[in-house]
Regions:
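Glycine-rich phosphate-binding segment of PLP-dependent enzymes
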Residues: 7-13, 17-50
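Conserved PLP-binding catalytic core of the aspartate aminotransferase-like
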Residues: 264, 268, 277-309, 324
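PLP-dependent enzyme catalytic core of the Aspartate aminotransferase-like
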Residues: 1-3, 305-345
Length: 345
């Protein structure tokens, strides 16, 4: 495994939440594809580029367990959401989460939608439901996994929300979720999910996708062609979209059940270890389930110690954020904890 992800050979990489790793095989595919473009020029664009995008849609439909007609390629999660918001009536009231990914609030604000926010807490899902009962909302928009704290929204709770508010449109930023956790779009009650490929899907930059229910398009009185027209202003990079298709196919070749189980085990192990050391925010420690992303309460000096020990992570707010993916090992987590314990003594 490590040989396919060269970065893993020279560091303890706990930074997938910031940037997923390139595989050696993806690099080889991109190199061969670029050389094909060099040789064929316009024929590459008119022939192979089309098939590359078709394959990306096909692989994503398998990953998301949905029909290909529900998949729309974009350059990123934010680009897809930004475009899609153009088709939502301006009088719709949004419910957001406080301290969610900043661009979500910024886009809703830029589009001049009225919105309210629910504060982060250990009982977030119940707080969302309570707020929905207090006043009328047309759209609930949130990240499945919080980029900062790593809080994992209980996706099973969506059913309870939809049962009580069947007309509510639920839109989800799945960038920190898809590729990390199991998900079945057709069985879910989410109306639309927006994803970037460069984190947990390990697809490099410049690619992403939307997954939209037909019932949502009908509700908004728009067609798939309307969505394509929103996203196809200009052009997409075939190499970026092809990388998404290749990376998703490669990820599925590892057996997704094994990938997700490994993530669950590593995440639980790290969660308990950090909770024991009192390094997590209280509202995170009090929850039963968590993602594989953690922001720990340590200062900049400790961040520098982690860097000196060749542990890749990133500063977030007043703490340090780490994340584990299937290519990490328990030994790497133990090494991180060892460095951490030694530094805080």
């Amino acid at each position: 495994m490590k040989s396919n992800y060269p970065t893993l050979e020279n560091c303890t990489y706990l930074n997938t939440a910031y940037c997923g790793l390139y595989s050696e095989r993806l690099l080889q595919w991109r190199t061969e594809t670029d050389l094909d473009f060099v040789a064929k020029g316009d024929y590459f664009k008119s022939e192979r580029a089309i098939n590359i995008e078709k394959n990306a849609v096909h692989q994503l439909s398998k990953l998301m367990r949905t029909e290909e007609t529900n998949i729309f390629l974009s350059t990123s999660c934010s680009a897809g959401l930004e475009a899609f918001l153009l088709k939502i009536p301006k009088d719709f009231h949004f419910l957001l989460l406080n301290d969610d990914y900043p661009s979500i609030t910024e886009m809703v604000t830029d589009h001049q939608f009225k919105f309210s926010e629910v504060s982060m807490s250990s009982t977030l899902e119940s707080s969302v439901l309570e707020e929905l009962r207090n006043r009328p909302y047309q759209v609930l928009l949130f990240s499945a996994v919080q980029y900062n704290s790593g809080l994992l929204f209980d996706m099973n709770f969506i059913e309870e929300i939809k049962n009580e508010f069947p007309e509510l449109i639920i839109l989800v930023d799945g960038t920190q979720y898809i590729g990390n956790q199991p998900f079945d779009f057709n069985r879910s009650l989410i109306d639309g999910i927006f994803v970037s490929g460069y984190k947990w899907l390990l697809a490099g930059h410049g690619n992403g996708f939307l997954c939209l229910k037909k019932s949502l398009l009908n509700r908004l009185k728009i067609s798939a062609i309307d969505v394509f027209n929103l996203l196809d202003r200009g052009h997409r990079a075939p190499i970026a979209m092809g990388s998404l298709g290749f990376a998703v196919e490669e990820l599925m070749s590892y057996d997704l059940d094994v990938v997700f189980q490994k993530n669950k085990e590593l995440g639980n192990y790290l969660f308990e270890a950090l909770k024991k050391r009192n390094l997590l925010e209280d509202f995170i420690s009090e929850r039963k389930k968590h993602s594989t992303i953690f922001t720990i309460k340590v200062n900049k000096a400790l961040f520098e110690i982690l860097k000196k020990n060749n542990i890749r992570c990133i500063q977030r707010g007043s703490g340090v954020r780490i994340a584990v993916h299937f290519y990490n090992t328990k030994a790497e987590v133990d090494f991180f904890l060892q460095v951490l314990d030694k530094a805080v003594k």
